[in-house]
């Protein structure tokens, strides 16, 4: 039986050491490796210069040093037939990826773990929240939304999930 392919697209920064990859965020390790038990996982992330504490046990990781290379990796995934795309959080990187995937009519899931409105307000200030809100509305209106808390989605049809419950049945 052939496994489905899931392309995880995330703003996470990954450190590369030879053929080994390390991340800071343990949740990303658990999510990517958990989905790897059910599917072929391609992981597209940003490159880091700092080694994280969690070694990823995945083979197909593409880490980009800039947005152009990041989007190039997205285009390269189109060789894989019937791939599903999982955007983890909404950031400028995942938003531009979403636009490409949406235009090319790919199956897109978005997984929201935290309130981006609050994060943008904290990082960039109150003036920036409208930028996130525009990205949020566009992405959530045109994808299947999975959230960790009901307060993360204004959409009527979203899936409230436990992170350990993301498996092959979703994709």
Model-derived features: where do they sit?
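N-terminal subdomain of nucleotide-sugar transferases
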Residues: 1-50
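Residues at the starts of beta-strands that form the adenosine-phosphate
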Residues: 4-5, 40-42, 107, 144, ...
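Anion (oxyanion) recognition and catalysis
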Residues: 36, 102, 139
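Short internal beta-strands
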Residues: 42-47, 111-112, 148
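A short, charged, and often flexible helix/loop element on the N-terminal side
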Residues: 48-72
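Short, well-structured alpha-helical segments in soluble
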Residues: 72-81
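An aromatic- and histidine-rich active-site surface loop
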Residues: 85-106, 110-117, 150-154
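Donor nucleotide-sugar binding/catalytic pocket of nucleotide-sugar-dependent glycosyltransferases
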Residues: 125-171
């Amino acid at each position: 039986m052939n496994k489905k392919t899931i392309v995880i697209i995330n703003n996470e920064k990954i450190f590369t050491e030879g053929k080994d990859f390390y991340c800071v965020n343990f949740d990303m390790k658990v999510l990517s490796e958990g989905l790897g038990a059910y599917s072929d996982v391609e992981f597209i992330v940003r490159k880091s210069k700092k080694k994280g504490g969690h070694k990823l046990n995945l083979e197909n990781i593409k880490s980009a040093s800039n947005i152009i290379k990041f989007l190039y990796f997205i285009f390269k995934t189109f060789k894989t037939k019937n791939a599903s795309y999982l955007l983890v959080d909404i950031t400028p990187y995942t938003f531009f990826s979403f636009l490409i995937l949406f235009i090319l009519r790919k199956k897109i899931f978005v997984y929201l773990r935290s309130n981006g409105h609050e994060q943008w307000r904290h990082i960039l200030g109150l003036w920036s929240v409208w930028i996130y809100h525009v990205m949020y509305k566009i992405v959530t209106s045109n994808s299947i939304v999975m959230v960790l808390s009901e307060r993360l989605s204004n959409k009527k049809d979203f899936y409230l999930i436990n992170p350990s419950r993301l498996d092959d049945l979703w994709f």
